[in-house]
Amino acid sequence: MKDISRLALVLTVIAAGAGLILSLVEGVTREPIAEQRRLQTLKALQAVLPPIDNAPDADTVSLVTGKDKKGRDISRTFYRGRQANDLAGVAFKVIAPDGYSGNIEIMVGITPEGTVNGIEILTHAETPGLGSKIVEPWFKEQFRGKGLEDADWRVKKDGGGFDQITGATISPRAVVTAVRKGLEFFREHRQQIIEAGRSEG
């Protein structure tokens, strides 16, 4: 009985020590991880927006886009890029939930009129050498200059205007659909996104 009590005490001390170490590590790494995410967002914004002279992550509008499974609001942040204080472009993230291997997160940059300036794939788990080719410049470049009215927002295999990837139609189809839905949301809420007062991001 004495050995069991001693063993329980030792295990308790080890568990408490491990918990303390984990909380210290989390505390030390929280800020660097947040800063890394911010830098990733800024890099994507620079890639998809036209030349700007403001900090788009400090000129944002957040709108509720729906509800999650628990009934909580889902919001989308719109980053506004300006040149000489005039709106030059808007960027926002979209999620393609129907990628071959899960979610594909995309940053979309558009003109104030709703034409795509560029897209950047932020995260994906698509098959290397197949679906992963959605990150290649030739694939992303075909979105530039396209709007809802002047493009058929389907891959060519489905009769649309976007090239798919040989052997991997699901990933490109998911990206095209997500970008189209993002453009539709922007069109529905354009005035609110463009004219809302600036808020700190």
Model regions and ranges:
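Flexible, solvent-exposed loop/hinge segments and secondary-structure transition points
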Residues: 2-201
